[in-house]
Amino acid sequence: MSAPPQPWSQRFEQALHPAIARFNASIGFDIRLIEYDLSGSQAHARMLAKTGIISPEEAETLIQGLEQIRQEYRAGQFTPGIEAEDVHFAVERRLTELVGEVGKKLHTARSRNDQVGTDVRLYLRSEIDHILQQLRQWQRTLLDLAQSHVETLIPGYTHLQRAQPLSLAHHLLAYVEMAQRDIERLRQIRERVNISPLGAGALAGTTFPIDRHYTAELLGFREPYRNSLDAVSDRDFVIEFLCAASLIMVHLSRLSEEIILWASEEFAFVQLTDTCATGSSIMPQKKNPDVPELVRGKSGRVFGHLQALLVMMKGLPLAYNKDLQEDKEALFDAVDTVRACLEAMTILMAEGLVFQTQRLAAAVESDFANATDVADYLASKGVPFREAYNLVGQVVKTCVAQQKLLKDLTLEEWQALHPAFGPDIYQRIAPRQVVAARNSYGGTGFDQVRQALAAARDRLNDF
C-alpha cells in the first residue's frame, strides 16, 4: 500500500513508501502551529489581493475558508492524520475542499520554507509573552515570601560550609535578581524573534510583486528579514530562546537543590506542606520533595534540546534542509517544560514551604559564622585586617578544640587575646547584629533588604 499523494508528487513516477511517509511526516507535532499557520495564511491572502496577484473576492474566500478551518480545529472537528505530511499541507488540502479551486491559489509567491519560519516565530513570540508573565508572577511570589522573612536569619554557605548569616529575604531576593535577568534576556530575544520571513520564498525571493512589509505589519512583526536566504535558514532565534530557557532552568534547579537540602532532617530548615509533597509506597514516614526534584531533573531535558540544536545547525549549508524539522519538538518540549516548572515552583514557594524559624535561629547561633565580624571588629580598632584575620583563625581553632563558641569566651579571655577587645564584642558578634551591620549597598543588612524589596516591586510595577 502506497502513501497518499502530496502536492509535490507529480514530479515522481512512484509513490512514497508508507514507512518513509511516516518517517518524513511532522503533522504529529507541528499541528501545534496550526493557529499561527492560519493567521499567516490570512495575512498572505490579504497581501496577494493588495498587490493585485489575486482578486479581493478570492482573498475574502480564502480568508473565510481559513477561519472555518480554525473553528473546526478548535471544535475538534479537524484532526489531520499522517496523510497530510505536515500542518501546511493539511490546511491547504482542507481549504481546497472547502472553497474549491481558489484554495490552490493561496500558496502563490510562498514556500513552506518561509511559511514554517513565520509559524514558528509567531508561536515563539506568543510563548515568550506567556513565560514573561510567569516569570513576573514568580518574582511576585518570591517577593511576598521574602517580605515576611526580612528578619528571619538563615545560615549562608560557601562550599556548602557555614559562612555568614543572612536575612532569609536576602537569600530569596537573589533568585528575584536571577529572574530579572531571565526577563531581560527574553525581552531582547523577542525582538529578534519578531522579524518576518514571509515572502522570502524557498530561498531566493519571488517573481511576484509582493509586499513583505505589509504582511509583516499585519502579523505584528517589526520588520521583514533583509535577506531571503537568511530568512529561511535562520534558527538563531530558537537557539537563543533555548539558551535563555536553559538559564531559567539553571536558576530553578539551584533553588530546587537548596529546598531539597533544607527539607532534609539533617537541615530541617523547612517543612513541606501536604499539598506540595508526596509519600513513599513502602516507608510510611516519608514526605518527599518531588516538585523540586522533578524541576532539578527536567532541567537536563532543556539543556539537551539546546545541545541538540547547536549540533544540528553547525553543519547545515544554506538554505533550508530537512534537518530543520528537528527544531520543533525540541522547542515545543522546552517551552512546555519551562512553563510547567515555573508554575509548579511558584505554587511550591507560595504554599508548599513552612520555614522553621526556631531551627533557623538555632542554626545561626551554633557555629563560627560570626568569625569575620571579630576580625572586622579588630580592624575597626586599628589592627591590620590580615593580622586580625590570623588571630581570629587561631581563636576559632582553640574554641573548636575546647568545644565552645566565640560567644562563650569571657571578656578576660577576649582581652587576653588582644587588648582592643571590649564588652561591646558580644553585641558585635550576635547573629542579628552580624546581619544588620552588613548595610552596604546590595548587602544583607535589614535596611538594605527592605530597600531591595521596594526596588524590586517598583520594577514589577513598571512592567
Swiss-Prot record:
Keywords: Amino-acid biosynthesis, Arginine biosynthesis, Cytoplasm, Lyase. Its main location: cytoplasm. GO terms for cellular component: cytosol. The keyword Cytoplasm applies. It is an enzyme of class 4 (lyase). It is found in: Cytoplasm. GO terms for molecular function: argininosuccinate lyase activity. The keyword Cytoplasm applies. GO terms for biological process: arginine biosynthetic process via ornithine; L-arginine biosynthetic process. It comes from the Bacteria. It catalyses: 2-(N(omega)-L-arginino)succinate = fumarate + L-arginine. Pathway: Amino-acid biosynthesis; L-arginine biosynthesis; L-arginine from L-ornithine and carbamoyl phosphate: step 3/3. Its EC number is 4.3.2.1. CDD domains: Argininosuccinate_lyase. PANTHER family: ARGININOSUCCINATE LYASE. NCBIfam families: argH. Belongs to the lyase 1 family. Argininosuccinate lyase subfamily. This is Argininosuccinate lyase. It comes from Thermosynechococcus vestitus (strain NIES-2133 / IAM M-273 / BP-1).
